[in-house]
Amino acid sequence: MESTLIILAVLVVAVLGRANTVALAASLLLVLKLLQVDQYIFPFIEKGGTFWGLVLLIAAILVPLARGTVTLRDLGHVFLSWVGLSAFILSLITTYMSGQGLQYLTVQGHSEVMPALILGAVIAAAFLGGVPVGPFITSGVLALLVKLIAKL
């Protein structure tokens, strides 16, 4: 019952803040709970959801390359402007940090920070116009911060 109330609260915050992706995800989980199929489907989502979500996200990002709307010439021009070069460098950094964050949460087993990451992502998506992909980057920054402080 408590978990249903928490997901319902997330749904309300998401709807109020117009965070459609969070609202849709919370709605899906609520429907699965109400249909009492959560014990069968939640383990699959929990185990493979991140992987399949990333596959779909990356596929969506790669569609312009697959369609041919982004050419080799376009890719070459990326390195000719400071904005393109900055985007490339920042992409390297944030992708690396996301990987560190995923490892921090899963391999290293620091799941105790997950509630704070979820709450921050939901609030940022609902009220700051953010997109809730931040928990991996956030946990990556956290992993680097923890490593840095451990060396002091």
Swiss-Prot record:
Primary subcellular site in the record, as a coarse category: membrane
GO cellular component: plasma membrane
Topology within the bilayer: Multi-pass membrane protein
One matching Pfam family: DUF441
Compartment(s) where it occurs, according to its Swiss-Prot or TrEMBL record: Cell membrane
Keywords: Cell membrane, Membrane, Transmembrane, Transmembrane helix
Residue ranges of the TM segments: 5-25, 41-61, 75-95, 117-137
Family: Belongs to the UPF0756 family.
Record-linked HAMAP family: UPF0756
Name used for this protein in its record: UPF0756 membrane protein Moth_1009
Species name: Moorella thermoacetica (strain ATCC 39073 / JCM 9320)
